[in-house]
Amino acid sequence: MPAAVDHDEKRDAIARIAADLIAARGLDAATIRQVAAAAGYSTTVVTHYFANKRAMLLAAYRHAAESAQGRFDALATECNADPLSRLESLLPIDEEGRRAWRIYLQYWPLADHDEELAIEQRWWSANGTELIRAALVQVCPEIDDADGKAAIALSVLLGIAIQATFDPAGWPASRQSAMWQAQCKLLLR
């Protein structure tokens, strides 16, 4: 009797491999052929799970975003760090964070022309804003305009992450953390 195949698990594994290729070499590296080779599958196996490259790339994006969310959630439940410090886990302060940002930034040009991906990007941005808003309120329950300040903080986080992704030597984890903490203090005044 053939071994049972967990199709969701295999689909997730292919999405993870595509994300790994994107992190290492950019979107152009994540062809169906390259992903199949990296997975040790035929292209037929990959196309069984994904109708085309676009569907595979969308799954890779979702995998990366959900992994970053999972990392944040795990940190939030595992440690006593203050809420604003926990948000630092969303920055490229280590290899896992740098990988996530390299993937995320590869999709920006696509989201400009792909409505489904743009919707996905907007949802994750709104999710990030809500995580930040909740942290700001937790640190300072009497904060005024928590929504507006959360949007500003998300912009700060994005700016730090972009700089650190493109200039990791100039933006080590210590500088990212110091900049994030300083900007959050300004918002909480």
Predicted feature residues:
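N-terminal intrinsically disordered/low-complexity leader segments
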Residues: 1-9
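Solvent-exposed, amphipathic alpha-helical segments
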Residues: 13, 17-24, 71-74, 103, ...
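Helix-turn-helix
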Residues: 13, 17-55, 59
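Short, basic, alpha-helical segments at the C-terminal edge of helix-turn-helix-like DNA-binding modules
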Residues: 62-67
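Hydrophobic/aromatic-rich alpha-helical bundle segments in the mid-to-C-terminal region
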Residues: 117-122, 138-188
